[in-house]
Curated annotation (Swiss-Prot):
Lineage: Bacteria, Pseudomonadati, Pseudomonadota, Alphaproteobacteria, Hyphomicrobiales
Superkingdom as given in the UniProt entry: Bacteria
Species this protein is from: Rhizobium meliloti (strain 1021)
GO biological process: methylation
Pfam families named among the record's database cross-references: FtsJ
Protein name from the UniProt record: Nodulation protein NoeA
Function noted in UniProt: Not known; does not seem to participate in nod factor synthesis but required for nodulation on some specific Medicago species such as M.littoralis.
Amino acid sequence: MARMADSKLVAAAPRPGRVAGSFRDPSGQVFHFQDRILRTMDSAAAIEFASAERVMRQLVDEGRLVDFSDAEPSLHQLFQGSIARVLQHPLLEQITYPYEWSFAGLKAAALFHLQLQLDLLDQGFCLSDATAYNVQFEGSRPTFIDHLSIKPYRDGQLWYGHKQFCEQFLVPLLLRSVFDITHHSWYRGNLEGVPSADFVKLLSTRHWFSHKLFMHIILPAKLQSSRTSQTKVDLGDSRARRLPKDAFRAMLAQLYSWISGLKVDVGKQSVWQGYAANNTYTATQRSDKGQYVAEFVAQHKPRTIIDLGCNTGDFSYVALENGAEKAIGFDFDPHALDAAFDRSVQTSKNFLPLYLDARNPSPSQGWGERERQGFSSRFSADAVLALAFEHHLAIAHNVPLAEVVAWVTQVAPKGIIEFVPKEDETVRRMLAGREDIFSDYNEEAFASALSQKARVVNKHLIPGSKRTLYTFERSE
């Protein structure tokens, strides 16, 4: 009777929706169903999965792989075709993409991927690809999400994911480490990383004498270019080639060592480098703002909080220390984000700093304009902090003040927005040397715009300044 009841409930439930980015592997696809993720497998995929199940369970126990279990048999009827097995996974709260990660975050993901490959290889398995999209973060801790890419290792097989690893991990890291160019816009524009062929065009002659650069990037790019230009390609040679297991392991270990040593030039001045220490606040004013945030979080107890303009994460940490379980910070300054990520690693707090240019947030894009979801589709929270944030859009980038307020209040149902008036030294610097065209930028206009989108619960003037903190609760 219980099984019959389950079947009736399943029949009445909405059908699972395929995750838009899950279309490349026909042997197993991913679906969103109610409060969980379902993963289907055909018979071949189910056999391979069963052979690796013990290893995968070990990875789950180590926190390196998203948990899995078999879905109840009644759920099989939701899918058409020859489905041999259906897994269920916990629903990840947020999905992030490599073009939103900091240099430090991308580096952590690359090292995580390589270590996973090495450990799998020791147990007779390997990863079938090397896409960065298979890594997600819980705080600053990376985890792997694609169970079906763990395959039995075949003796002598080539590393078919080498090019993908280089373009989705190594080249974006080198772009910053060698040229001090951030990867975010390039990666987002291409989606599959930064092409090696494009990166090679940036290299000078001296770079060609680097053995690692030549072997992993320059030579493969040149060979690829040569193959593409041929009218006839002989695939037999590549299929006959063998890569001994020791050589495979040595290649992974070399990449691990190389990437571990990649650094950015912290001596170069960034837009907000040292901002926390050199802004227009006094220590007393900063402490006052922190106390206000602490009281807000203690009162409302948001599980997840979003910190817009997080810099190195000071106020995210205030939130975490006063009852928030998880903080996601956003900023566009690469040095601040790297410092914030390193801080998260060192403290083991559930804080993930991500890249965001609020003028141009990550859009929905890729195949069907749905393969990778946009910012607003993926990021929402119980509360939002927008401290010293709105004037960077309204003054520095001419976004209408009312639209800035509307955008911030969509991120969470409650939060704190700081209004920074024209009399503030920071805004005066922004307006220096340019015409002040912002006749409607004032606190009255700000308060009016906020009251149209939310209820103003409280406001607090930071002592010794003209900045005001507004606590809001959105009108539903």
